[in-house]
Curated annotation (Swiss-Prot):
Organism: Mus musculus
Function of the protein: Subunit of the phagocyte NADPH oxidase complex that mediates the transfer of electrons from cytosolic NADPH to O2 to produce the superoxide anion (O2(-)). In the activated complex, electrons are first transferred from NADPH to flavin adenine dinucleotide (FAD) and subsequently transferred via two heme molecules to molecular oxygen, producing superoxide through an outer-sphere reaction.
Membrane topology, as annotated: Peripheral membrane protein
One example of a Gene Ontology biological process annotation: cellular defense response
Name listed for the protein in its UniProt record: Neutrophil cytosol factor 1
The encoding gene: Ncf1
Length: 390
């Protein structure tokens, strides 16, 4: 797995789901070595199967050979009929279990089995749709409660943002915010939907409705990459604003600027424009996984379309115009298409190689003088020798 490892794990709570049948899943916030934070959902039966496999991989540390050598914590088996009370009471057990695992030597705490278990799966990104008859019920661990044992491996510092306008949720997985509300951002999804918490509420909020407290600019926005990354559209989109781009499904484009609000700058030929990142998939990857992610949720609104936005900052956000993107993009493409400039040439027309030692040139050989010139300029002795030789 290289240098990949998990820094922290926090238990956020659990969900009661009804599709395909009633069951419970636990919500974990996982912080990786690159400081990225992801929310994953796992059933207790999955966690227990993970535990059994871990014991098989490390029988000595599991106490299978000698009980006194056991360091892997105990995890009780699931019951036949688990209800909401059992799901709630089990949160403390899970916290202690993963707290114990993360404190073990790296051969266990960073083993591929543990890392793979907490990797984001397609189902973790598949949010319930409004068409579902009964939506999941979320039960959160109190943020400041006395029995808050959700923090498994240490504090996870969440970034704080402020809402610049009222946003009314349109589904059960979103969260309503009012102008001036301060929220903690749990996860920044590339789609432009951020998972936030405010007191005992959690849900998805469009990133365009949020601003940092210390600056109007998003410090984590990367710089443009005019070399471009190849992507494919997995859903058609018709431009609404002048600086957006209309594309059909299945078109190949290049992404030149990935912005955290979920509206990326893409390039098609020499044309650039904004396009929803939710409708893009990296070229060469399975499209079916990305299509699962966009079901039941549309592209987030752009900040330019928000009415009555009220920022606490005096200056507005710094944004490049599409004219600037196009101009810089065209300049980059022209330089890329231009053949390489020849290096300095030597007198014989060949390129000089700086790594090759230079040889001093030999002096030029003068042309041989003619016989008449020799007879005219030579001495009498030389004339007699030349005359006798003829």
């Amino acid at each position: 797995m290289g240098d990949t490892f998990i820094r922290h794990i926090a238990l956020l709570g659990f969900e009661k789901r009804f599709i395909p049948s009633q069951h419970y899943v636990y919500m974990f916030l996982v912080k990786w070595q690159d400081l990225s934070e992801k929310v994953v959902y796992r059933k207790f039966t999955e966690i227990y199967e993970f535990h059994k496999m871990l014991k098989e991989m490390f029988p000595i540390e599991a106490g299978e050979i000698h009980t006194e050598n056991r360091v892997i914590p105990h995890l009780p088996a699931p019951r036949w009929f688990d209800g909401q009370r059992a799901a709630e009471s089990r949160q403390g057990t899970l916290t202690e279990y993963f707290n114990g695992l993360m404190g073990l030597p790296v051969k266990i705490s960073r083993c591929p089995h543990l890392l793979d278990f907490f990797k984001v799966r397609p189902d973790d990104l598949k949010l319930p749709t409004d068409s579902q008859a009964k939506k999941p019920e979320t039960y959160l661990v109190p943020k400041d409660g006395k029995n808050n044992v959700a923090d498994i491996t240490g504090p996870i510092i969440l970034q704080t943002y402020r809402a610049i306008a009222d946003y009314e949720k349109s589904s059960g997985t979103e969260m309503t915010v009012a102008t001036g509300d301060v929220v903690d951002v749990v996860e920044k999804s590339e789609s432009g939907w951020w998972f936030c918490q405010m007191k005992t509420k959690r849900g998805w909020v469009p990133a365009s409705y949020l601003e940092p407290l210390d600056s109007p600019d998003e410090a984590e926005d990367p710089d443009p990459n005019y070399a471009g990354e190849p992507y494919v559209t997995i859903k058609a989109y018709a431009a609404v604003e002048e600086d957006e781009m209309s594309l059909s499904e299945g078109e190949a484009i290049e992404v030149i600027h990935k912005l955290l609000d979920g509206w990326w700058v893409v390039r098609k030929g020499d044309i650039t424009g904004y396009f929803p990142s939710m409708y893009l998939q990296k070229a060469g990857e399975e499209i079916t996984q990305a299509q699962r992610q966009i079901r039941g949720r549309g592209a987030p609104p752009r900040r330019s379309t928000i009415r009555n936005a009220q920022s606490i900052h005096q200056r507005s956000r710094k944004r490049l115009s599409q004219d600037t993107y196009r101009r810089n993009s065209v300049r980059f493409l022209q330089q890329r298409r231009r053949p390489g400039r020849p290096g300095p040439l030597s007198t014989d027309g060949t390129k000089d190689n700086p790594s090759t030692p230079r040889v001093k040139p030999q002096p030029a050989v003068p042309p041989r003088p003619s016989s008449d010139l020799i007879l005219h300029r030579c001495t009498e002795s030389t004339k007699r020798k030349l005359t006798s030789a003829v």
